[in-house]
């Protein structure tokens, strides 16, 4: 938690001035009851209008000064809280970018979004309230009691009895409701997670006619949240009547003692008014203090969750520069797996077991296998999205772990299964591959990816807007643009992870032909469920339950690999493979 306080270092001045100005405001507030008592005891008693007007002017001046101090304190506290949350959000976002796929899988997207938004907002609100009240409320409670004793020590003894009783009620309710508020926050996170899941998968929900099921699921979670919030609300609502009962009893006692003191000449009627005002000030500040503790408790709980993400160490350590030289006997290697195994965190069984193969520069490597056979797991090791649990992965003759992050990702570009585009334009999306690429290079990549024709047909061409997630493009168009984006970077190794699934056979064949015709020694890994897409590959890796059960050309595998032959025959009979 101390690490998170470091983000306040740029706002030390504001963090000091905010509570100080609040204490100044409280100081002026403490003088108000005395001035009011003076008006009653002197001005009204003597029927001195001038005296009354002067004291009213003093009250107005105190109000203006107090308001100025309050606004100044609010400005500084808001500046510190907003600046702190902004710095924290930037740091958290930057830290998330440094996490590997493994940590992202463990934490979960919904969790990270909640930490970035509602949790940091809660921390901001708690800090803002803390800076304004953590000194003011105790100062007013103590100050009001001291001022009460200056008015009349005997009557002020009622404060000595009332304040502990008020504290027991206020803080007792707080102690009871604090863990319940945490439970309510957990249930709120659940509702937010369900909402995000539903909105993300809204098309699937519609496709399977599951709207009512989703409504029922949401209502169940929302009902649990509502019940908890109502329960907490009912308990918190007890605070107001109980405290006002104590205050009213104390006020009655003050009036009784005050009347006796007035009769014997021990105090004036204005002093009773001052004591009642001090009692009300104490009540208000105790309620504020209890609310502050509840809000700060929520903020600390949220801060703890944010800190847990910040404490998550990136699982991959990238060197600052290349660590090794390429041996002469490996100069022609593009990718080499040497007895590689992979087990995901929390998984009981390995996803890959004892995989060994070598892909030469310029080769096209096909990867095929049934669902869950480990195809994506295998290609995700090449750009080092994950580290192998056992064995060694070598890229262009060097261990993958010897490359700096930028160097490795510059040499290996991946087109994921899900075609992900970002809001902007076609040009801005393509420039992710190489921010310095010229228009000629962009069009060349589009042509290779079989996307030039439909981009040229757009009214604005490269500057055609792309909505968030590419909502205004078809599945095939998005896939071709993501392939073009990868090609813009001119990588040494290109991985197509089932990223042509939305393309028809003709377009798929044209894409493979265009990739083969590219100059240089581009090595292409094609992950596909279609045997037809891989039959012209230089090598085909056949995976089954995480194991490499076949390695060779299409013709070789048909003779030697039963798994490949089964896949081929099943698709051929369905007309999914062309001879």
Where are these regions (language model features)?
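Transmembrane helices of ABC transporter permease
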Residues: 10, 14-27, 38, 59-62, ...
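ABC-type nucleotide-binding domain
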Residues: 327-579
């Amino acid at each position: 938690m101390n690490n998170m306080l470091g983000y306040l270092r740029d706002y030390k001045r504001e963090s000091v001035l905010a509570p100080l100005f609040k204490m100044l405001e409280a100081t002026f507030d403490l003088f108000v009851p005395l001035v009011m008592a003076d008006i009653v005891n002197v001005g009204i008693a003597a029927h001195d209008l001038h005296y009354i007007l002067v004291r009213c002017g003093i009250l107005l001046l105190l109000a203006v000064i107090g308001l100025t101090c309050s606004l100044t304190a609010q400005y500084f506290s808001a500046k510190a809280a907003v600046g702190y949350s902004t710095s924290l959000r930037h740091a958290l976002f930057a830290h998330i970018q440094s996490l590997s796929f493994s940590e992202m899988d463990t934490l979960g997207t919904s969790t990270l979004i909640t930490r970035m938004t509602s949790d940091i907002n809660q921390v901001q609100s708690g800090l803002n309230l803390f800076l304004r009240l953590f000194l003011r409320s105790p100062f007013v409670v103590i100050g009001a009691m001291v001022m009460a004793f200056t008015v009349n020590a005997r009557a002020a003894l009622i404060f000595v009895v009332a304040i502990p009783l008020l504290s027991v009620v206020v803080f007792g309710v707080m102690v009871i409701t604090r863990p319940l508020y945490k439970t309510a926050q957990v249930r709120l996170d659940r509702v937010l997670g369900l909402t995000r899941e539903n909105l993300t998968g809204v098309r699937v929900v519609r496709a399977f006619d599951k709207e009512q099921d989703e409504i029922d699921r949401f209502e169940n979670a929302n009902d649990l949240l509502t019940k908890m919030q109502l329960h907490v609300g009912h308990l918190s609502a007890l605070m107001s009547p109980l405290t006002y009962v104590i205050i009213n009893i104390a006020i009655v006692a003050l009036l009784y003692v005050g009347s006796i003191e007035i009769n014997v000449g021990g105090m004036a009627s204005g002093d009773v008014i001052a004591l009642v005002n001090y009692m009300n000030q104490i009540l208000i500040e105790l309620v504020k203090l209890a609310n502050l503790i509840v809000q700060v408790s929520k903020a600390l709980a949220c801060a703890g969750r944010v800190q847990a993400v910040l404490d998550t160490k990136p699982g991959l350590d990238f060197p600052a520069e290349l660590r090794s030289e390429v041996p002469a006997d490996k100069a022609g290697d593009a990718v080499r797996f040497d007895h590689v195994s992979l087990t995901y965190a929390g998984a009981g069984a390995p996803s890959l077991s004892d995989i060994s193969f070598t892909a030469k520069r310029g080769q096209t490597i096909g990867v095929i296998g049934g669902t869950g056979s480990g195809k994506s797991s295998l290609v995700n090791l090449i750009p080092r999205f994950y580290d192998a649990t056992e064995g060694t992965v070598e890229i262009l003759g060097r261990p993958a772990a010897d490359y700096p992050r930028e160097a490795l990702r510059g040499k290996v570009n991946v087109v994921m299964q899900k075609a992900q585009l970002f809001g902007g334009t076609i040009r801005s999306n393509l420039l992710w591959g190489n921010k310095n690429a010229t228009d000629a290079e962009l069009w060349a990549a589009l042509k290779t990816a079989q996307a030039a024709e439909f981009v040229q047909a757009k009214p604005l061409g490269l500057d055609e807007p792309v909505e968030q997630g590419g909502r205004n493009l078809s599945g095939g168009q998005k896939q071709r643009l993501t392939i073009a984006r990868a090609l813009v970077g001119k990588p040494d190794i290109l991985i197509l992870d089932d990223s042509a699934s939305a393309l028809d056979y003709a377009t798929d064949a044209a894409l493979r032909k265009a990739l083969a015709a590219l100059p240089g020694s581009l090595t292409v890994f094609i992950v596909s469920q279609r045997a037809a897409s891989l039959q012209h590959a230089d090598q085909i890796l056949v995976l089954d339950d995480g194991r490499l059960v076949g390695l060779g050309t299409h013709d070789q595998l048909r003779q030697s690999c039963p798994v490949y032959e089964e896949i081929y025959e099943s698709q051929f009979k369905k007309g999914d493979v062309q001879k």
